[in-house]
Regions:
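AAA+ ATPase "lid" subdomain C-terminal helix
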Residues: 240-246, 254-267, 307-310, 328-330, ...
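Mid-core helix/loop region of P-loop NTP-binding domains shared across ATPases and GTPases
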Residues: 2-9, 14, 44, 64, ...
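Conserved C-terminal helix/linker of AAA+ ATPases
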Residues: 259-284
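Walker A/P-loop nucleotide-binding motif
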Residues: 43-68
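A short, basic N-terminal segment
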Residues: 1-47, 70-73
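Conserved catalytic segments around the Walker B and adjacent sensor/switch elements
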Residues: 50, 74-91
Length: 393
């Protein structure tokens, strides 16, 4: 059966897609341009080494690749031959010979993969650059895998190429990319010092930048009016709990779109986000639900009902209390006070079942807003009904 897709171009959500501009990384981009500005004025007189660090999903690879495109244009305007080469070291198990071979094949596609030592292939690379009269930035992504495999000797080989060749044009500069500085501890002091002279550190994204990033991808990847703003906010909040991981946020947006399309939905609803994240992260722990009291379970059932029946991403406690009162009638129970229910909500938030935030004055006053971010409402409702049946036998 074919489904009406809400996607316009889902390739814009692919992990390898490089946007024209990396949002909220202007400072880091300016630093990269400044460190390598010599390439536009005196490219043969110096070589540069920059270490870019940041946790998963902070945009390390994207900002370096975007910089590579920009610097290539700027250097080209000066009539200088230049290439930005990006190699993921982990793809080659940190083997320096294979990494250098990959760089060589940029210029000689059929260069033999075997039969050369590390020193020989490095010299071959330098010779090719000299013959081609070209300058290069070699960006080594996941550089920690090379450090783990090769140690200080590899760092020396790469960073001290021109120490004894001052008269020759210095044609290679480096960008080293890794998550943090910890892998450098295995290197000797001299190698550590060489790598830590120029460091660009990417901080984790907070919620608002993630919203901007998601909205940018929504415009590119989805049809108009198929991704409501509260869905974008929900995904951004979830990604914030995953250490500000933009990659996670974009994947969750894509998965949510897939769940919506599979249901022939006209837009992504919060429930599809909950379904998508429950497929990525185990969310509902039966032991946690079993440990709740009767009225806690009834309040949680009220939350599940609200989000099952409404397409909103957030509710107020007043919304939930109305449904809770109906459930109390169904089970012939006297409703608990507002204060006690608020304490239950706080407990739910503590164990990760719900999230709370203060609502904006412009929308629903300063009341506390409640969301069910990671558990599909229907799944939670079924689980609670099953428990009620077992407990009342």
């Amino acid at each position: 059966m074919s489904h009406q897709s809400i996607f316009k171009d889902e390739s814009k959500l692919d992990i390898n897609y490089l946007p024209n501009r990396i949002l909220h990384r202007d400072r880091e981009n300016r630093l990269l341009m400044e460190f390598f500005s010599f390439l536009t004025s005196c490219p043969d007189r110096m070589s540069q080494r920059v270490l870019v660090i940041g946790e998963v999903g902070t945009g390390k690879t994207a900002i370096c690749q975007a910089f590579g495109k920009n610097i290539s244009i700027e250097v080209g305007k000066k009539g200088t031959k230049f290439r930005y080469i990006h190699v993921n070291c982990r793809e080659y198990r940190g083997n320096l010979t294979q990494i250098l071979h990959q760089a060589v094949t940029v210029f000689q596609q059929h260069f033999p993969a075997r039969g050369y030592s590390t020193g020989e292939i490095l010299n071959t690379f330098l010779q090719i650059l000299e013959e081609e009269q070209v300058f290069v930035i070699l960006a080594l992504d996941e550089f920690d895998s090379l450090i783990e495999k090769e140690g200080s000797d590899a760092v020396y080989a790469l960073t001290r190429l021109y120490e004894t060749q001052h008269e020759k044009p210095q044609r290679i500069s480096f960008i080293f990319i890794q998550r943090n500085l910890t892998p450098l501890k295995v290197l000797d002091d001299s190698a550590q010092s060489t790598l830590q002279r120029n460091i660009i550190s990417l901080e984790r994204y907070t919620k608002d930048p993630l919203i901007d990033i998601l909205n940018d991808r929504v415009k590119l990847a989805f049809e108009i009016a198929t991704v409501p703003e509260d869905v974008v906010e929900l995904i951004a909040e979830l990604a914030t709990t995953e250490l500000g991981n933009a990659r996670f946020a974009i994947e969750l947006l894509w998965r949510s779109g897939k769940y919506a399309t599979a249901q022939d939905a006209e837009r992504i609803e919060p429930e599809y986000v909950r379904q998508a994240i429950s497929a990525i992260i185990p969310t509902i722990k039966r032991s946690e639900l079993c440990g709740l009291g009767l009225h806690e379970k009834m309040l949680l059932l009220a939350i599940a009902r609200f989000f099952k029946e409404n397409k909103e991403a957030f509710s107020t406690l007043a919304d939930i209390e109305e449904i809770y009162a109906v459930i109390c009638e169904e089970y012939d129970e006297i409703p608990y006070s507002h204060t006690q229910l608020w304490k239950y909500i706080q407990r739910f938030a503590h164990i990760g079942i719900v999230k709370t935030k203060v609502g904006s004055a412009a929308t629903r006053g300063r009341s506390t807003m409640i969301s069910l971010p990671t558990i599909p409402a229907q799944e939670l409702e079924i689980e609670l009904y099953t428990m009620f049946k077992l407990e009342r036998r």
